[in-house]
Amino acid sequence: MKHIARKRFGQHFLTDRLIIEGIVEAIAPLPGQPMVEIGPGLAAMTRPLVERLGHLTVIELDRDLARQLRSNPQLTVIESDVLRVDFLQLAEQVQSAGALRGAASQTPSPCKLRVVGNLPYNISTPILFHLLDAVEVIEDQHFMLQKEVIDRMVAMPSTSDYGRLSVMLQWRYAMENVLYVPPQSFDPPPRVDSAIVRMVPHAEPARLDVKLLSELVRVAFSQRRKLLRHTLGQWLEQHAFSGEFDVKRRAEEVPVAEYLALAQQVQTGTAQPEKIELL
């Protein structure tokens, strides 16, 4: 019986064989690597991935699809909302299971988790933020997303796409758009263009309180057209910031590095030797 895509799950199933091959080549899975696929759906990517890996863990919310996936002994199926999955715990479980299968000897040690998937477009941003909590145990991520979301992720300052998502993700990842995927590659076709993004965690990111940085950036971009003195300036005063930061700019004009430096100063209560003036 054919599975009908469910709108409430944001389901669009990948069917283009050439695109699937291109995605798998971009991921370049190796035997024994610990990998998790989010939203395997009808297993279009799952099958070629598991052929190369030997075993694959998948997270699927749709009960009917999860039941079908369990028929493959090479898959470990987690039937759950991905936003409820603890990826720190999952990484440990996947790595331990791989060691029991004798896979650990085929991959570098320690083996970090590789995460892939065709993310539901209606909750893709929450998933990306959810994974920030587990970035220390992740080797890389390859996701199918709306192209416009990827444009925002990799955007540079002083562009219309540059925003909170750009700052938060560029803090932790080096990212690139590796493959364009047209709507006709799916069934049913989405009304948007899609693409594959590669996300590789930075080896030594700035050590920051993620909640503080997220709040700082959210406030900064809350009114994009206004100067920062009307938004972030007030927030800095509320946090008794004694350093200097130029708030006669709009949020989109401030580079990622400056946001990170400012968050570091607010977090530690110190100012850099070269002052950034709060004007």
Swiss-Prot record:
The catalytic activity, as recorded, is: adenosine(1518)/adenosine(1519) in 16S rRNA + 4 S-adenosyl-L-methionine = N(6)-dimethyladenosine(1518)/N(6)-dimethyladenosine(1519) in 16S rRNA + 4 S-adenosyl-L-homocysteine + 4 H(+)
Name the Pfam families on file.
RrnaAD (PF00398)
Keyword RNA-binding carried by entry? yes
Top-level enzyme category:
transferase
Q: What Gene3D superfamilies does the database record attribute to this sequence?
A: Ribosomal RNA adenine dimethylase-like, domain 2 (1.10.8.100), Vaccinia Virus protein VP39 (3.40.50.150)
Q: Describe the function of this protein.
A: Specifically dimethylates two adjacent adenosines (A1518 and A1519) in the loop of a conserved hairpin near the 3'-end of 16S rRNA in the 30S particle. May play a critical role in biogenesis of 30S subunits.
Q: Which family does it belong to?
A: Belongs to the class I-like SAM-binding methyltransferase superfamily. rRNA adenine N(6)-methyltransferase family. RsmA subfamily.
Q: Where in the cell is it found?
A: Cytoplasm
Q: Which GO terms describe its molecular function?
A: 16S rRNA (adenine(1518)-N(6)/adenine(1519)-N(6))-dimethyltransferase activity; RNA binding
Q: For binding S-adenosyl-L-methionine, which residues are annotated in this chain's numbering?
A: 12, 14, 39, 60, 81, 118
Main location group: cytoplasm
Q: What is its EC number?
A: 2.1.1.182
> InterPro entries per the record?
KsgA/Erm, rRNA_Ade_diMease-like_C, rRNA_Ade_Mease_Trfase_CS, rRNA_Ade_methylase_Trfase_N, rRNA_adenine_dimethylase, SAM-dependent_MTases_sf
Q: Which GO terms describe its cellular component?
A: cytosol
What's this protein's name? Ribosomal RNA small subunit methyltransferase A
